[in-house]
Regions:
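Function-determining surface determinants
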Residues: 1-303, 308, 315
């Protein structure tokens, strides 16, 4: 069953609100889930704005602020989890990893306090007002349908992903590869919108995006941890191990890079493909109407109101 972007946005706002209590308690799972919710909302809001005819700029900024505050704590949680994983895999470096884990936990405490204060300062109820059409922002008024807006954003995100993949090259550039991850995330959440609204259901695209995103996420976490160890001049053996792990996962990414190019190309073609599909369907519908109209005419009784009168067999 399909649903509209505004309805999806309202549901996702409810999801975000459901995690607020856990965020205030500093719970790892709530912070992660709330962060994902803000990511989804950032892609939904613009499309929903075109549906209800309201600018979602202020609401978007609100969600972005919430997402950034959540992201700061979420990254620390990911690094703590990675330290615990490596402690099991690298017993010889368990002491060094345990020390780093302790530092990360200490760093998390003030970050969690900042997160709670940030959320207290944000008027999150304004999100519900925005989706209900009560937002104080300007009217969109551009005449676009939400499907047109969605198609344009999918095309844009596809182009951004293609550019990021090309710029990352086949050599390991941590920051460039992180940009690939960011663009892939944005595109993936937009594809979710397309699937849930039944505007577009590309085979395997979202599944493939999730797989590559997982690899890129693993690389990013290890790179962040590596930089912390390097800055403190820690165990050279552990640093070498993390570097080797990154190299292995980067090789996995390169094996899937062609799939990213195909994803991006499909997304860039999407608006044109949809327009062509609508034209074909309209042409077929018009072709079906012609014989139906002909059959209707055959069954009609001739109108004799204007026929000439016949008197005595002659035409008068």
């Amino acid at each position: 069953m399909s649903t509209s972007p505004a309805s999806l946005t309202a549901t996702q706002i409810d999801v975000l609100f459901a995690h607020l209590s856990g965020v205030r308690d500093g719970r790892i799972d709530s912070i992660h889930d709330a962060r994902v919710s803000t990511r989804r909302l950032r892609e939904l809001l613009h499309v929903a704005g075109d549906e209800i005819g309201v600018s979602m700029g202020p609401a978007y900024k609100l969600v972005r602020s919430a997402g950034r505050a959540l992201g700061a704590v979420r990254e620390l949680d990911s690094l703590v989890s990675l330290c615990e994983t490596l402690m099991n895999l690298q017993p010889a470096a368990a002491g060094t990893l345990a020390t780093m884990r302790g530092r990360l936990i200490e760093e998390r405490r003030p970050a969690a306090r900042r997160l709670v204060k940030t959320f207290e300062s944000l008027d999150l109820e304004a999100l519900r007002d925005a989706v209900a059409g009560r937002h104080a922002g300007t009217r969109a008024g551009n005449g676009r349908t939400w499907r047109t807006a969605l198609g344009e954003r999918i095309e844009k995100r596809g182009g951004q992903l293609a550019a990021a993949v090309d710029r990352a090259s086949g050599v390991y550039f941590p920051k460039r590869l992180h940009q690939v991850r960011i663009q892939l995330k944005k595109l993936r959440y937009l594809i979710e919108v397309a699937e849930q609204t039944r505007a577009w259901r590309p085979a395997n695209l979202r599944h493939d995006a999730e797989r590559v995103q997982s690899v890129l996420g693993d690389i990013h976490d290890r790179q962040m941890l590596l930089e912390r160890f390097q800055s403190a001049d820690h165990d050279p053996g552990l640093i070498a191990t993390i570097r080797a792990d990154i190299a292995h996962r980067h090789a996995q990414y390169l094996l899937r890079r062609d799939r990213l190019h195909l994803m991006a190309a499909a997304c860039q073609r999407y608006p044109a493909d949809q327009a062509r599909r609508r034209w074909v369907l309209a042409s077929r519908a018009a072709a079906l109407l012609v014989p139906v109209a002909g059959l209707a005419l055959i069954g009609q009784t001739p109108d004799r109101s204007h026929a000439p009168l016949r008197l005595g067999g002659e035409v008068s």
